[in-house]
Amino acid sequence: MKRRYFILPALLLMLFSACGDDENNYQIGGKKGEDTPVQPDDRQSEGPEIAKYNLEFPALKGGKSVVVVHYGVYNDRLNKSGYNYAVEWDSEIRAQRWSCYQMYEDNYKSGAQVTRYNAKNDGSLSPECQYPNDPDLPESYRLTADPYKGSGFDHGHICPSADRQRAVEANYQTFYITNMQPQNNKFNAGIWQDMENQVRKWANNFDTLYVCKGGTIDKSDWILRYLGSGNNKIPVPKYFFMAVLGKKGSNFKATGFWIAQDSYTATTLQSYAVTIQALQKNTGIDFFCNLPDDIENEVENIPLSQMEKEWTWFK
């Protein structure tokens, strides 16, 4: 049974000053002084503390999967640092299952825009290359060579670089190889980019946007092929998804995207819009599980036609 909590501004200050790194930065949305309901899911007990409270986290897979949480400076002008984003990495499949993150005033909207990280793409995975290894991932789980290089597939960002352009460090962290999935260029630079632009426009209409995105890696018929070999062999997902939860004041609403990167035809984003309930059935992932049950059931089970009316579509 899940227990319900309300994260209050005063409690947030206590958490920030008294807890360890994983417990520091519950960046809860909503207007100043307003409670945000949180009902931690028991399935989060083996993960980092932040996964028990932050609403963007789905239910953790467990087993041979680990959750890596990235912290750093997220706004250079305001000199603010804390939680950036998190990723679930399957050490057996050697691929990421999802990245999750938040978009709100200080980490997305305000402050000067920094230049996108750009370095030599030599496939070395060194800290100085374009797609470095994740320093927070246990060394035994890391790739030793970049399987994307020469494959014809793009390094497809899951937490986008463009969503983290208020600080050099936060932007650099989005280039970790753990935040990538293989995408063909037409998809990555086309409709996937359109979906990311759509999410960014939505972020301007909410106090906080909670986002979880990824590609399918858990079933053979969800995988197009593999890149690399040996310990550097990674799957190419057939399907990609986005789960988006918006909070404004005390109100929540949610939507999702589900798309096959090799066989999509429609160019309108609404063609790929799905309810969270449908997305959960498609992916096997339980999204927004830290919401209280009544709110979770309401936002996840809304009829598709009603969901489409509640969101503003820009393409």
Per-range role (PLM):
Residues M1-Y5:
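Positively charged n-region of N-terminal signal peptides that target proteins for export
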Residues F6-L11:
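Sec-dependent N-terminal signal peptides
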Residues L15-A18:
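C-terminal motif of bacterial Sec signal peptides marking the signal peptidase cleavage site
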Residues G20-K315:
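Domain-level detector for secreted/extracellular nuclease and nuclease-toxin modules, and
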